[in-house]
Amino acid sequence: MTKRALLSVSDKQGLTDFAKGLVALDYELISTGGTKKALEAADIPVIGIEEVTGFPEMLDGRVKTLHPKVHAGLLARRDLPAHMAQLKAAGIQPIDMVVVNLYPFKATIQQPDVTQAEAIEQIDIGGPSMLRSAAKNFAAVLPIVDPADYEQILADLQTDAVTPALRQRLAAKVFQHTAAYDALIAQYLTTEEFPEKLTLTYDKKQALRYGENSHQKAAFYENALPTHFSITGAKQIHGKELSYNNIKDADAALRMVSEYQQPAVVAMKHMNPCGVGLGTTIEAAWDKAYEADSISIFGGIIALNRPVDLATAEKMHALFLEIIIAPSFDDDAFAILAKKKNLRLMTVDFEQTHTADKFETISVGGGLLRQEVDAAFETPADFTVVTVTQPTPAQLKALAFGQQVVKHVKSNAVVVTTADRTLGIGSGQMNRIDSTKIAIGKAMKQAGYENAILASDAFFPMDDCVEYAAQHGIRAIVQPGGSIRDKDSIAMADRYGIAMVTTGVRHFRH
C-alpha cells in the first residue's frame, strides 16, 4: 500500500527538498492551504486535505484537518485487525507521517503593538491535534515537527533505517513542542502573578561544559519570552564560551549595576559584589570599584552602565577578568580588550532596563519558589532618624549608597561605604557581628574610612554590632529596624554619639 504523508507547515524551510525526497520514496502527499500552494509551485504532486475529508475548509481556515478521516488515519493501530477493519469499513486510508510546525504564536506576540485578537488568531488548533495523534501512535506514524530533522529522517527512510528509538525520540520532541506551545499561550493569557498552575516554557540556549563544579552536568535555558535586559538577552561579542558560574555572576552584576543612574561599576565574585564604585565618568567609577578590593577583583565579573572607553579598557586590560559586560565598547577599547582571547566581552541594551524580569523563580526539592524581584530602593526620604545625633547631608548620601549596595550582598550582610564606593563587605556569615567585623576589618585598610558609614541588610538582634562599629570609628548607620531590642541598639548609638536611621525594609538575600 502506498504510504501517505500529511504536510502542513508555517515554516517552509527545507520543505520542497524533503517533499521531493518523499515522492521519490513513493509517498502520496496530502497538504493544506499555503503548504499545498508551495508544493504545487515546485511542481510536486500533492492532494488537498478536502479531497481526503470530503469537507471544505471553513471558518477562514480555522477548521481544516479536524476530521475523523484525518485522525482515524493517524490513530489506528496497524497491529490491531479490528482497527484496520474499521478504517476499511469507513473508507479511511492510514496516514503514515505528519509533518507539521505550528502557527507562529511566539513571533506574533513579540511584535510591538500586537493586539490580543491578532495573537489569538495565531493559536494553532489543528496542528497540535495532528501532531499529538501522530505522536501517540509513533509505532506506526512518524511525527515530524522540526525542519532540522528532515535530512536525517529522509536518509533513514532511504536506507530503511527508521528505528523504534528514532520514532520515540520524534514523539517526545512533539510532546515537548506542543506542551511548550500551550504553556506559552497560557503564559500570555494569564494575568495572575501567582496562578494555581504555573506554566513556564524555556528553550535551550546553550550546552555548558559543566555546572557549578566539573562533575556536574548543566545547560543554559532561556525563557521562551525573553526580556531584552537580561543575561539571556546579552550579546557575547568576544571570548570563550560562558560557564555556569559566569552566567550566575554576570546576572547578579547586571541586575545590580542597572540600579544606578550615574556612571557605575560593579565587580562581582561568587554572587557577591567585591567592589562598587560611582563616578562622574566610567573611568572614575572603575577606579573606585578597583580600589574597593584590588585583591578580590582578580578573576571577577565586571558590569558597567556606560560604554567602555579606551582609558577604562587599558586599566581593565592589566588585570585577569572573566567577563566585562557593558552597553557597548568603543572601537579602540574593544581592540585592546580583545587581545585577551579568553576574556568574555558582552553587551546589553541599557535602554531596555524596564523590561527586566519582575519575578524570580528558584528550584527546591520537588518544587519551585517564586517571588517578586527585590526592586525596593530606599532614599533619604524613606529614612527615620532614631538617634539624638542627626546624620549630616554627606552622611545621608553615603547611607543611601550603602543601603543600595547591601541588598545585593548575601545575608547576613553588612557593608561599609563612602558616598561613592564600597570600603568593606561582610557577606554570608551565620551571625551579624561576624559580618560586621569582616566589613569593618576590610574598610579600615582603605583611604576614606574616616567618612565611612555602615549598612545592614536586616535589623541588629543585639547592640554588639553597633558598639563594635562605634568603637572602630563608624559615625552613621542605616538598618531596617524592627528588632524587639531596637532600643538597645539605639541607646548604644546614642552612647557613642553616632547617627542611626531605619528604613523599615529588610533586604535578605540567600
From Swiss-Prot:
Keyword Endoplasmic reticulum: no
Catalytic activity: (6R)-10-formyltetrahydrofolate + 5-amino-1-(5-phospho-beta-D-ribosyl)imidazole-4-carboxamide = 5-formamido-1-(5-phospho-D-ribosyl)imidazole-4-carboxamide + (6S)-5,6,7,8-tetrahydrofolate; IMP + H2O = 5-formamido-1-(5-phospho-D-ribosyl)imidazole-4-carboxamide
Documented EC number(s): 2.1.2.3, 3.5.4.10
Coiled-coil intervals, chain numbering: none
Pathway: Purine metabolism; IMP biosynthesis via de novo pathway; 5-formamido-1-(5-phospho-D-ribosyl)imidazole-4-carboxamide from 5-amino-1-(5-phospho-D-ribosyl)imidazole-4-carboxamide (10-formyl THF route): step 1/1; Purine metabolism; IMP biosynthesis via de novo pathway; IMP from 5-formamido-1-(5-phospho-D-ribosyl)imidazole-4-carboxamide: step 1/1
Residue span(s) of domain MGS-like: 1-145
GO MF terms, alphabetically ordered: IMP cyclohydrolase activity; phosphoribosylaminoimidazolecarboxamide formyltransferase activity
InterPro entries xref list: AICAR_Tfase_dup_dom_sf, Cytidine_deaminase-like, MGS-like_dom, MGS-like_dom_sf, PurH-like
Keywords: Hydrolase, Multifunctional enzyme, Purine biosynthesis, Transferase
Biological processes, Gene Ontology terms: 'de novo' IMP biosynthetic process
SMART domains in the cross-refs: AICARFT_IMPCHas, MGS
Matches recorded under Pfam families: AICARFT_IMPCHas, MGS
Domain of life: Bacteria
Gene3D superfamilies registered for this protein in UniProt: 3.40.140.20, Methylglyoxal synthase-like domain
GO CC term, one of those recorded: cytosol
PROSITE patterns (alphabetical): MGS
Domain text: The IMP cyclohydrolase activity resides in the N-terminal region.
Xref: PANTHER family: BIFUNCTIONAL PURINE BIOSYNTHESIS PROTEIN ATIC, BIFUNCTIONAL PURINE BIOSYNTHESIS PROTEIN PURH
Family of the protein in this entry: Belongs to the PurH family.
Name of the protein in question: Bifunctional purine biosynthesis protein PurH
